[in-house]
Amino acid sequence: MHFKQSKVLVIFLLILPLILNYSLPTKAASAQTSPALYVGVDVAFESIVETEQLIDNISSYTNFFVIGCTGNYNEDRLTTISQYAYDKGLTFIVYTDLPRYPSKQWLEDAHNNWGDSFLGIYFYDEPGGIQLDQSDYPFVTKADNYSDASNKYVSSLNWWLRSGPDAITKSFGTSKYQLFTSDYSLYWYDYEAGYDTVFAEFAQNYSRQLNIDLCRGAATVQDKDWGVMITNKYDESPYMEARIDLYSDMVLAYDNGAKYIIVFDSDKKWTQNVLTKDHQDAMKQFWEYAQSHPRGISAVSDRSAYVLPKDYAYGFRAPTEDRIWGLWNNDSLTLSVSMSMAALFQIFGNNLDIVYPNELRTVESIGYQNVIYWNDTRILSNLQPIQSPSPIQGLSGEQPTLLALIQQLSYMLFYAIVAVIITAVTVVTIVLKLEKAPAKK
């Protein structure tokens, strides 16, 4: 290689990190997550015949099944469907919201009859969402502050999962059984309460990536598993999203590392299935995609973490219009935290986890490429106030909206990259001119 070319290459290599890296502390490590994949359907309607027909239809392109109880705690029905799923080569779990269903005897028989194909119990649905919306039977209705709410939520839910005399795990005859749930908020605290796996819900028009980042982050820091539950988009027929959207959601979950990808199947009254042939075709198409695009082991060091304030359980369904623990309205931190998250989405894309401080295991020890705390002023220090076309909840029109913030960040990143490229070209040009200049005698 000529000397001139060597100099150009060296200069380019020196400048390249300026283009690729965001100037935050690096925390490199080799922590990794499992590439295993479970794909299936969560059936929440009653009919045994229709359930078996669905299993027949999907068993060639799924490997996982969720058996709902639909309010009818019938162990004979449960045994029949479990055996049918097992005979079709599916792994499966069972939903319940009663600590004594299935019975201890049924669970012992399940281990003997189906071995590792029966993975565990999906106990209680959406505990975090119920808390956030204060719907039927929330775990906390009154608290002195955020930390008090956190302690009460975790201890109350854990009482039903593991520590209380009637806890569901007291019926487990083997430590191999896992505890599952599906939720749309407070994933971090679901894990703290004792769940082994939480499915982040893809529902309505809420941000898929945001829920992935919150659930995956909680699972990663607490060394648990996570997945996605694609549930109803509408409150009435056709209930589920279109085929193309279902396929896209499954691919998104897969590409982000979800271990479980599940499609919910039931109408609002839990009386009949809602998945059409189009939906089943989308699942088959995804199965083929997963077979032709095998995942490697995803290193945590490829991702960055944004650390929220301790016990700041905001719902994040809107930049400033959700609630904290279901007990308080937004506060002075809400807007700045939402803006910081929007900025980091723009910078890191799907390589961002959103987490909380962990007393047992520091976030820095996990192995993230970058760890950014909520009060790191560098995130927003260069943003200027811009006029909002529609001020939110009486906030000043000078406050940036989430959309405007993203647009502004796009311009900033564009101009920064252009500036770096111009600098690189200038430096290379000067070096080349110096090479051509006659040497002084």
Stretches with model-predicted labels:
Residues A29-Q393:
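Glycan-processing catalytic domains of CAZymes
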Residues M1-T33, I58, L395, Q399-K441:
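Secretory targeting signatures
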